């Protein structure tokens, strides 16, 4: 990946990443010698960031150099998925360099919109290649996107990026709620955020078969990982199991043993915080901005989706072929933007339930 501040200053014309922050830091005395940007390849798993790029070793060396040059500890600032990478780094360096390293070299950590417990949008992205960003774009752009890079092609691509799997939600129902209640439900809620995925029939004029259980129509966080495994290929399943854990550990002895197990280092619910008494952790999040929390989904075959597209005069179907192993249309999921229930609280928005 590109390195230095230029690697993440501006994403595109009018869209800045770190450039405005860099400019404001420069105004209060920071310069190129005192600011380092650690760019990483977010497609890679945490293990492979070190195995291929020696990313964490380089980051460790940067902190040690700063301590020698300036005689004081550094501040680590992260954004979004960078928060997860940062937490893995703290556990990695504690394991590799000893329990005193963080206390010696890092003054504080500032996490901006950190993804420590994952994000809801990761689940539909892996299942369907969709999220609110894609289903709400104008119809013309949606047509072009589906024509040249379909949702199923996007989902297949997302599932090859082991790094993005670190964004899958962690902690199960204890954190995200169950089928009747979630901690962030509003007082007058008629729908609970605990049902992360709410499936509706492909044909809205029909009901689900009696054989479809409530657990199949409403998928909670604890059931989500198994649901994801059932709807994705073996390669993705092996990658997930060999790189990440999604649980919530309460046993102290197991938490201590997890400190030696690198697949738990992206999950702050299964490992202890770093042994650094003076380390300060600042977590900054937006307030008052609607955020994706749960989804309405429709589950049908590739033939169902092909028929729907043909009805809309979108006859491209190259990516919706039949399964080679069974000869039957593939089972796929889509965010269901048809669901518009003004009498529900929260009100569905383009197939999503928005939370704080």
Question: Regions from the language model: what does each represent?
Answer:
Residues 286:
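Glycine-rich anion/phosphate-binding loop at the beta-strand->alpha-helix junction
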Residues 1-160, 165-194, 199, 211, ...:
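N-terminal non-catalytic accessory region
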Residues 14-25, 52-67, 201-275:
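A Trp-anchored, charged/polar loop motif used as the substrate-binding/catalytic surface
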Residues 276-282:
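Short, proline-enriched alpha-helix->beta-strand connector loops that line the catalytic pocket
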């Amino acid at each position: 990946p590109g390195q230095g501040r230029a690697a993440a200053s501006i994403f595109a014309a009018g869209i800045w990443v770190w450039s405005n922050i860099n400019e404001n830091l420069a105004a209060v005395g920071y310069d190129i010698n005192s600011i380092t940007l650690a760019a990483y390849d977010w497609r890679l798993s945490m293990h492979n960031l070190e195995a291929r790029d020696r990313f964490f070793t380089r980051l460790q060396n940067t902190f040690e150099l700063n301590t020698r040059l300036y005689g004081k500890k550094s501040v680590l600032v992260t954004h979004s998925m960078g928060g997860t990478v940062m937490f893995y780094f703290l556990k990695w360096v504690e394991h590799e360099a000893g329990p005193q390293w963080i206390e010696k070299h890092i003054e504080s950590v500032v996490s901006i919109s950190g993804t420590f417990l994952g994000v809801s949008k990761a689940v539909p992205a892996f299942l369907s290649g969709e999220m609110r960003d894609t289903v709400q774009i104008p119809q013309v752009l949606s047509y072009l996107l589906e024509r040249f890079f379909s949702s199923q092609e996007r989902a297949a691509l997302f599932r090859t990026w082991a790094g993005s799997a670190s964004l899958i939600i962690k902690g199960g129902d204890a954190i995200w709620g169950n089928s009747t209640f979630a901690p962030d439900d509003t007082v007058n809620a008629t729908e609970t955020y605990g049902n992360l995925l709410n499936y509706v029939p492909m044909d809205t004029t029909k009901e689900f078969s009696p054989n479809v259980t409530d657990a199949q129509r409403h998928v909670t966080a604890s059931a989500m990982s198994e649901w994801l495994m059932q709807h994705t290929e073996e390669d993705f399943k092996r990658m997930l199991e060999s790189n990440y854990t999604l649980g919530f550990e309460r046993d102290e002895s197991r938490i201590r043993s997890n400190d030696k197990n690198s697949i738990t280092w992206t999950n702050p619910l299964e490992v202890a915080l770093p042994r650094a008494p003076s380390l300060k952790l600042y977590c900054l999040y937006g307030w008052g901005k609607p955020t994706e929390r749960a989804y309405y989904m429709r589950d049908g075959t590739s033939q169902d989706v092909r028929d729907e597209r043909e009805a809309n005069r979108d006859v491209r179907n190259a990516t919706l072929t039949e399964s080679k192993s069974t000869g039957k249309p593939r089972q796929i999921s889509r965010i269901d933007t048809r669901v518009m229930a003004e009498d529900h609280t929260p009100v569905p928005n383009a197939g999503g339930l928005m939370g704080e």
